[in-house]
């Protein structure tokens, strides 16, 4: 019986996931659109910055891992523009602690650095010369609602709600990050 359950679990991992496929398709479209000049003059780099919100830490980690794998296997094209430009998943717990099946522990310093390197113009510290200290290292940020309040991510061009929270005000808070 346990062997059969293990087989079922393995085959369920191979089943197509239409929701993830739709996310990947949306990212392709957004990256392609960011390549074209915009009438407002907004930079291509800022327009392809995307925040993907999910309610659950497990989902955030899964999305991150699957996107990283997809980007590394795709030929040169729109979604491969994001290769090596996806930040570590941001949730309310350390990724290593979460993978061990435990919860708790928030890496505030690491989160602040990631945010500053995702949106250096709006979320990083300013040095004495008036320039942002963060580097523009990331274009995709996958996060739980831990980043839905009190974080200035206005440099991002898009928000994707991978799943919807039970409280509709959470959606308003998520969208308030980019105006």
Regions found by a protein language model. Give the residues of each.
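Conserved SF2 helicase motif VI
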Residues: 167-179
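Short secondary-structure boundary/capping segments
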Residues: 66-71, 156-159, 175
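Conserved Helicase C-terminal RecA-like lobe
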Residues: 1-135
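SF2 helicase motor core recognition
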Residues: 61, 126-136, 141-156, 176-178
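Generic structural signal for small/hydrophobic residues in well-ordered secondary structure
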Residues: 23, 52, 153, 174-176
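Structural motif
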Residues: 51-53, 142, 160
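Short phosphate-engaging motifs
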Residues: 59, 149, 167-170
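Short beta->alpha connector loops at strand-helix junctions that form conserved
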Residues: 162-165
């Amino acid at each position: 019986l346990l062997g059969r359950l293990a087989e079922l679990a393995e085959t369920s991992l191979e089943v197509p996931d239409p929701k993830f496929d739709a996310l990947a398709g949306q990212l392709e479209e957004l990256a392609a659109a960011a390549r074209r000049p915009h009438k407002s003059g907004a930079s291509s780099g800022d327009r392809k910055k995307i925040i993907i919100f999910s309610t659950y830490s497990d989902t955030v980690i899964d999305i991150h891992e699957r996107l990283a794998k997809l980007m590394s296997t795709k030929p040169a094209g729109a979604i491969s523009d994001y290769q090596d430009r996806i930040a570590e998943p941001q949730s309310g717990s350390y990724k290593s602690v979460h993978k061990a099946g435990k919860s708790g522990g928030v890496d505030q310093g690491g989160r602040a650095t990631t945010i500053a390197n995702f949106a250096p113009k709006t979320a990083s510290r300013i040095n004495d010369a008036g320039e942002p200290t963060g580097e523009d290292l990331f274009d995709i940020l996958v996060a739980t609602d831990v980043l839905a309040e009190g974080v200035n991510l206005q440099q991002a061009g898009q928000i994707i709600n991978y799943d919807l929270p039970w409280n509709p005000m959470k959606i308003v808070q998520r969208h308030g990050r980019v105006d």
